[in-house]
Amino acid sequence: MASPTPAPSAIQRRVWEGRIPLEITLSPAECRTYDKADPYLICYPRVSYLPFLLPRLRAFFATSLIDIEAQDYQGWFSFEGVPLKWHYPLGLLYDLYSGADPVTSKSTVGEHLSHTTSPRQPNDPEPHNVHEPGDPIPWQLQVHFSDWPDQELVRLDADGRVIHDAFINSVKEADFVRNGTAKRIMTLSKEDSSGLWQAVQEHDFTNFQRISNILIPGGPNHFRNIPLRIFLPSPPNSATPSLKVIQSLFPPTIPPAANQTGAPGRQTQPQPQTIGSSLNSLLPSLFPSKRIPVLAKPVLQGAVVPMTAPLEEVVRVAGYADGWLAIVVSMVG
């Protein structure tokens, strides 16, 4: 007997609780210890942002830093020498740069979204120095507190306004794409507006979902367009790493097909806009089929998304905290 389809809120919670094991080391150039400082190990939420870790990382590496005056907001992260954009959620960064194979088995996708590793509960001890045998291999990152890469990253500030404003602006943009106006986010109460950001910072699913439900219209076909961004990373063997971001407007449904004379075709009802139809429209050379990933596959939240999945349903349950559906293109084979 087939398992019942999880309610959207259950899938949302699984996505929200997905975590990635991290092993964060201090940049050797900034470390006063000859054989390097101990790494900081943590299972961190996919939907969260790396700068939230900076205060605890600054405290953890305090005795190892050459520059004892370095401030937490001066911190930035890199992977294999590539500065990581702090306004991207961790899950997106991982899908872009880690090189890990996305989940493809239908039987394990739900489990993967539920916990890339087991979700850490509020009362659990801080897992900054333990890696148990058999646990997933952590993603190895470096944290830096000097030599800010101004060409790649906007500087953070001591008050946290820069990252706050970047997040809220992204929420506003998603709201405008969905509704043709940013009225919903602009008319949020002051309490809900600050509560949204606080829920993201504290990884509070209950409060986040309550406020998100105000912003995102309920029921089918209530979106004017889907907030969708497609990320095209450079090939692994590329000499110069690069990232192309493609954004376009996609309504939740496709109008009935018309024949060459302009008369209605066989399809008289609008068809759902799917992952495959949107990718075929944007990147036909990579996605020549709307139903089968021939040359490339769409990756979201660490899993390969079915090409036939309706775009609106996917964004409702698997979008990131800012309301955007961020799909990474991964080559087949």
UniProtKB/Swiss-Prot annotation:
**What residue spans carry the Basic and acidic residues bias annotation?**
123-133
Cross-link for Glycyl lysine isopeptide (Lys-Gly) (interchain with G-Cter in ATG12), residue positions: K172
- Coiled-coil-forming residues are none
- Compositional bias, Polar residues, is annotated for 258-275
Recorded GO CC terms: Atg12-Atg5-Atg16 complex; autophagosome; mitochondria-associated endoplasmic reticulum membrane contact site; phagophore; phagophore assembly site membrane
Q: Where is this region: Disordered?
A: 107-133, 256-275
Show the GO MF annotations: Atg8-family ligase activity
Alphabetical keyword list: Autophagy, Isopeptide bond, Membrane, Protein transport, Transport, Ubl conjugation
Where in the cell does this protein reside? Preautophagosomal structure membrane
Describe the processing and modification events after translation.
Conjugated to ATG12; which is essential for autophagy.
Q: Which family does it belong to?
A: Belongs to the ATG5 family.
Known role: Involved in cytoplasm to vacuole transport (Cvt) and autophagic vesicle formation. Autophagy is essential for maintenance of amino acid levels and protein synthesis under nitrogen starvation. Required for selective autophagic degradation of the nucleus (nucleophagy). Also required for mitophagy, which eliminates defective or superfluous mitochondria in order to fulfill cellular energy requirements and prevent excess ROS production.
Protein name, entry field: Autophagy protein 5
